[in-house]
Each structure stands twice: as C-alpha cells, then as structure tokens.
C-alpha cells in the first residue's frame, strides 16, 4: 500500500467517525464513503458526497448535514488543512501538503517496484493475443493487438494479477494446406522444375525464400517421393519457417509469450471430441439435417451454431470451444481474448459455449482491436513505399521507430478506430506525445548527471520539508497517483490510461522545471531535496514507459 492509499484510508476513517458524532449513527450504519479527486484543484484534493447519501436516513437537507459534519472533521486531524462545503452538500478537503513529501523516500526505495500493488490479489488471468495465422507478415491490426495485449499484461501483473500470455497458432486449417502447397511449388521452382502454383496460394517473397531453403536443405530428395510424404515434411518446415518469422518480429516489437499453443495439439492430444461430449452431457447438443448443432440460443446468441457439418468435417467453432475448455482446465480464473474487429460477431457464441460447458460467461472477456488507418502529412497511406503492398508491422517500425509505434498504439482505447499520424510519430517536438514524455525522462537524467559531476548524489535523507512551492506539490501529487492509475488501468483493461498519466506526469515535471532552479549551489539543502524529487519523477516515468514496452532514454 502506498502513501496516497494510506492517507485515503485515514481520511475515510476520519469522515466515518465525524459522521458517527454529527449524525448519531453507529459505525456499521454509515454508508460506504467515496472519495473523488476534483477535476479542478481549486475544489480541493478530495471530495465526498456522504452528506447526500445520509439525507434519507437523517431526514435533513444534504447541506445541513454537511454543516454538522464539518466541525467534527476539523477536530484533531493533521492530515486536513481545510474543509469546505460546496453546492448542495459536497464536502471538499484540502490536505496538508506535508504528507506528500513522505512519497519521495518511498519511491526511491521501491524503484522499479514503484507502482506495484496487491489490487489483483493473485487472480489468474490468461491473455491470448495476436494469434495471427502463420502464413505471412503481421499487419497493422496485429501490431495494435500486440501492443495492447502486451501492455495490458504488464499493467495487470504490476497491479497484482497472475498473468500468462499466450499465442494460439492456427496450424490446423485449410490455410496451412495452402501454405504447404505454395512452399512445394516454390521448392520445385527453386530446383528449376515446372510446378503449377495453387490458386489460393501465398505469393509473398517469404514463400519464395522458403522454397529456396527447402531446395538447399533437401536437394531433389523429395521430387520423386509421394505427395503425402513430401507435404508432410514440408508442413513441418513451412510452419517452423513462418512461426519463426512471427516470433522474431514480435520479439523485436518487445512482445513475448509464456505459451505458444498449437491448434494441431488439440487433435493430437484428443481434446476436441471430449469437449463435444461435455456439451452433449450438459444437454446443449442436437442433430439436425445430418449436422451436429450447439444450442447457443439458450444463452442469448441469435441462432444455434453448427459444430460438425453434414459431411463430417468440423467447423472452426468446435476446435475453438475445445481450446477454451483447455484454457479453463489449466486453472485460469478469467480468459481475456484480444480479437480483431472482424471477430466482433463471434463474441456471443463463444460466451454461450463457455456457459454451455458449465462455466460462468464472465470467465471470458473479449477486447476488440479496431482498424488502423495510416496518415502522413494529412494523406492516408495504404501501401508501403518499400514494397508497394499493404503496410506491415515491420514496415511501420522501420518508418517511425519502435518506441513511437508501441506508444501510439497504446494511446487510444482498443475499441476505437485509430488514425495513426506517421508525421507526428516521427516529429522531434513536444507535439509528439512519446517524444514529450521521453524528453522529460532524458532531461531529468541530464540534470542528475550534472549534479553528480558537481558531487551531488541523490539521497533518501534529504530534507523533503524544503519542498514547498506549488509546482513541487503538484508534481508530488501526480507521482502519488501512479499505483492507483496502474490498478485502474488493469481493472478497466485500459492501457491508454497509462499514456494519459505519463503525459500528465511529464507536464507536471516540465512546469516544475520551468519555475524552479534544481541545481542551486548557493542553496545545497534545497538542491538535494529537488534532486531527490526529480529522481522519483525519473523512476515513475521509466516504470510507466516500461509498462507500455517503450524505452526511457537517458539522452535525446
């Protein structure tokens, strides 16, 4: 628990005791006391509507109740500097800012752990994201999903959740057959032999490279073997080639996974039919027109869904159900699936399947990643300058940089369409959101280096009571909010709240820097306190950027 949270608890307890004294209630009769941070700091550090909540019980107007509570609040409390009544009965609190300086040694001590909490209480979450077919490059939707998924996992972990990241490899569908046929055709081509290219094949340069690799590895060994043998071998190589490429691109994007789960393993380990039997045992399976159906309309889906077609082949829904059953059987409390915008209509049937399996539908959450449109100099960009084809994740990183790509994708709620301004992302000005935040970190690093060159080290025992200017207190207040913001971002599944916070923190630092001299050799004690203060800002900026997979540069 951080200093800010401790003070909130103290303040809530003080309000409760004031209500007991002023209104004559027992402690157990006092309703939950809610504290809000006013948008305008002129209205105090915190505000509560407890007087409104008590109006019915006390049979008085809220303002009259507030007037009876305020004198009790002013008694014997060093935390509160001033209390006032606003509007119909809101009670606004102005705290004694001295408590804020207690934050500095705490942040200096916690360092990389600053922002951690037990908010999640160790609840086990699995986040499955990206899960692109292993048949080509990652596109912009995948990139946005990767940035959101990885940032969310980082945030939830810091907030005290037990988080596992998973990539589901779609390696059992018809698209893999097309991949193998494409690789086979390019293999023959690399050997100088004629081969008909499949109508639905993959024509990318990577498949040409794969064909050359196969020719170099095997020579003409598989020219005259049976198709079954050749394609069985090429399937392994093609999947290894494509998944290796995906892994490399994602690692470059600073995204890693705890588990790469193969769809094929569901069949190899006999996980699909037991899932079907469980649905049947629970009474939600029926046969009609030679097909096997799941009665998802029992769970508010708009129509029932086919699991096995009349020709005996599975729909993609059945292995998806088996996969989600497997995830739940691994002991996760909640599953978070991050899907592309084209999967929005798939949510009701998947939640219905979860319930039909005997689990709560609340154990599945789905975050939808909306479309990304690229713009440069106000003009929409549809094709890569380098390849003349659709822009890939790799293209975007090469164009604007890794940090800007990660940060910009985290700036907006995932369920909103995004216009990605490449010109802004490349800008080295304060108009560029990631540059603005990184520059604050770099500037602090520069000041700390200058202080060190003059023999001034950051120390926890500096006299923090010397921090008394409004800009210093404002910076401290923002610093103290970090753990709460992380917990809120985790609870709301909203990485963009971290972006908003980092912008606020950078702004608070820049205001402080513009109005206070940090290195003042004529006032060493104040200098030491301010060095400690900016070090805490540096730590918090770094921790926040790390959550988003963005670097915190020492120099810019």
Curated annotation (Swiss-Prot):
Q: Which organism is it from?
A: Listeria monocytogenes serovar 1/2a (strain ATCC BAA-679 / EGD-e)
Entries under InterPro entries matching the protein? aa-tRNA-synth_I_CS, Arg-tRNA-ligase, Arg-tRNA-synth_N, Arg-tRNA-synth_N_sf, ArgRS_core, DALR_anticod-bd, Rossmann-like_a/b/a_fold, tRNAsynth_Ia_anticodon-bd
Keywords from the UniProt entry: Aminoacyl-tRNA synthetase, ATP-binding, Cytoplasm, Ligase, Nucleotide-binding, Protein biosynthesis
* Listed CDD domains: Anticodon_Ia_Arg, ArgRS_core
Q: Reaction catalysed by this chain?
A: tRNA(Arg) + L-arginine + ATP = L-arginyl-tRNA(Arg) + AMP + diphosphate
The question of whether Acetylation is a record keyword is answered with: no
Please state which protein family the record places this protein in.
Belongs to the class-I aminoacyl-tRNA synthetase family.
Q: Name one GO molecular function term.
A: ATP binding
Q: Which PANTHER family match?
A: ARGININE--TRNA LIGASE, CYTOPLASMIC (PTHR11956:SF5), ARGINYL-TRNA SYNTHETASE (PTHR11956)
Does the entry feature the keyword Protein biosynthesis, yes or no?
Answer: yes
Q: What is this protein called?
A: Arginine--tRNA ligase
Query: Where does this polypeptide localize?
Result: Cytoplasm
One Gene Ontology BP term is:
arginyl-tRNA aminoacylation
Q: How does it assemble?
A: Monomer.
**SUPFAM superfamilies assigned:** Anticodon-binding domain of a subclass of class I aminoacyl-tRNA synthetases, Arginyl-tRNA synthetase (ArgRS), N-terminal 'additional' domain, Nucleotidylyl transferase
Q: Which GO terms describe its cellular component?
A: cytoplasm
User: What S-S linkages are listed for this chain?
Assistant: none
Instruction: Check the record and name the SMART domains matching this protein.
Output: Arg_tRNA_synt_N, DALR_1
Location of motif 'HIGH' region in this chain is: 132-142
Lineage: superkingdom: Bacteria
Q: Which gene encodes it?
A: argS
> Might you give the EC number(s) for this enzyme?
6.1.1.19
